[in-house]
Amino acid sequence: MLDIQFIREHTDIVKESQRKRGESVELVDEVLSSDTARREALKAFEEARAQQKEIGKKVASVPADEKAKLIAETKELSQTVAEYKAKADSAAEEYTTAMWRLSNIVEPEAPEGGEDDYVVVKKVGQIRDFAAEGFEPKDHLTLGAGVAGIDMRRGVKVGGSRFYFLRGQVARMQIAMLTMAVDQAEEHGFTLAITPTLVRPEVMRGTGFLNSHADEIYRLREPDDQYLVGTSEVALAGMHENEILDLGNGPLRYCGWSSCYRREAGAAGKDTSGIIRVHQFDKVEMFVYAKQEDSYKEHEHLLAMEQEMLAKVEVPYRIIDTAAGDLGSSAARKFDCEAWVPTQGRYRELTSTSNCTEYQARRLNIRERMEDGGTRPVSTLNGTLATTRWLVAIMENHQQKDGSIEIPKAMRAYMGGKEVIEPTKWEA
């Protein structure tokens, strides 16, 4: 949610942000109109109530012959007050509804355009020349089957499309990767949290995911009115809902480990095989509560953390600055790290890090205590540190001619010193 005072004073900036996102510019006028109606209705209600109280005070002190008249006026005014109260409540509801539909203000540096209008910030690593090595690279699904590590057939049998089993050494590789991510996060001062994967509607709405991504989210049927999270960002944001934080010693940094669930409603025909786009996966997510003036520095820090992790798994990648029209409603700016996938001949997203400024904090009422005793909303930021999809890039970029998979050096200590995952037959 945005600051209404900012919207009043900088209407053009908010409208320009909506335009860059490809969202309704007229919504800004709707917010301002409902704001005016809300304030006018509230003023009328408060004036009528004050008048009612004033007359009520006089009843006890006036002569008996005047009391009947004042009592009649009080009753009549009570009806007026009730009507004004109803109008004020209705106006407040319309205002809140409009405000919650507004997306965060895009940072001026974010590129304009849609999904394909990102800007490549830099490329890191050397893309392998498999032709020079004398063999055609296998895709991750073929490699996974060859080492008895990815079972899509039985995953579909159990859960339906886009489900899978990770088994054996590939399952161990995921655990190793996620554990390595947690260790790195803790080394940088993040606190590990195993988070809930079911959240209340108020928390999901507060993070902004019900604005533009509602169709991607699983929701439990009544009477259990809860949502399955697509990232631990949701739970970590809700953890300090309605709290006042002490950021005097620096940002609060969390590292969330959770299973994640996504409907992939808009993904018909995309990545229908393999584990790139699935309904359930595991992820380690960074989440930060920071002072408003520190959010940009923290955003750079999260991006550096992602790059450090990518260096450990030794895959070529690039960083892109996401265009305004491809930002989620909460993000003011977002950077993605995309790894090279040899068999697809293109880069695929592995991480994203977003600066949500005060947008989520205002919606969830999360503030910090200031030195003067006052409070103000904090900034929230998030970033991926490792997720199931990383296995695709690791397996394909580290494959050998015989179908084996070389384990990245940094991960070997997490796999008992093992250096290579050898081809093996299914036991069952």
UniProtKB/Swiss-Prot annotation:
- Per UniProt, where does ATP bind? 262-264, 278, 349-352
Provide the protein's localization: Cytoplasm
Tell me the route in metabolism or biology where this protein functions: Aminoacyl-tRNA biosynthesis; selenocysteinyl-tRNA(Sec) biosynthesis; L-seryl-tRNA(Sec) from L-serine and tRNA(Sec): step 1/1
- Is 4Fe-4S one of the keywords UniProt gives this record? no
The set of disulfide-linked cysteines is none
Its GO CC terms?
cytoplasm
Q: What class of enzyme is it?
A: ligase
Q: Under which EC number(s) is this enzyme classified?
A: 6.1.1.11
Name any one GO molecular function: ATP binding
Q: Can you tell me which residues bind L-serine? A: 231-233, 285, 384
Q: What is its main location?
A: cytoplasm
Q: Which UniProt keywords apply?
A: Aminoacyl-tRNA synthetase, ATP-binding, Cytoplasm, Ligase, Nucleotide-binding, Protein biosynthesis
Q: What's an example Gene Ontology biological process for this entry?
A: seryl-tRNA aminoacylation
* Pfam families reported for this sequence: Seryl_tRNA_N (PF02403), tRNA-synt_2b (PF00587)
Q: SUPFAM superfamilies given for it?
A: Class II aaRS and biotin synthetases, tRNA-binding arm
Instruction: Spell out the reaction equation it catalyses.
Output: tRNA(Ser) + L-serine + ATP = L-seryl-tRNA(Ser) + AMP + diphosphate + H(+); tRNA(Sec) + L-serine + ATP = L-seryl-tRNA(Sec) + AMP + diphosphate + H(+)
**What does the entry's free-text domain comment contain?**
Consists of two distinct domains, a catalytic core and a N-terminal extension that is involved in tRNA binding.
Q: How does it assemble?
A: Homodimer. The tRNA molecule binds across the dimer.
Please name the PANTHER family in this protein's record: SERYL-TRNA SYNTHETASE
Q: What does this protein do?
A: Catalyzes the attachment of serine to tRNA(Ser). Is also able to aminoacylate tRNA(Sec) with serine, to form the misacylated tRNA L-seryl-tRNA(Sec), which will be further converted into selenocysteinyl-tRNA(Sec).
Q: Tell me the protein family, please.
A: Belongs to the class-II aminoacyl-tRNA synthetase family. Type-1 seryl-tRNA synthetase subfamily.
- This protein is called Serine--tRNA ligase
Q: Species name for this entry?
A: Bifidobacterium longum subsp. infantis (strain ATCC 15697 / DSM 20088 / JCM 1222 / NCTC 11817 / S12)
In the UniProt record, the gene name given for this protein reads: serS
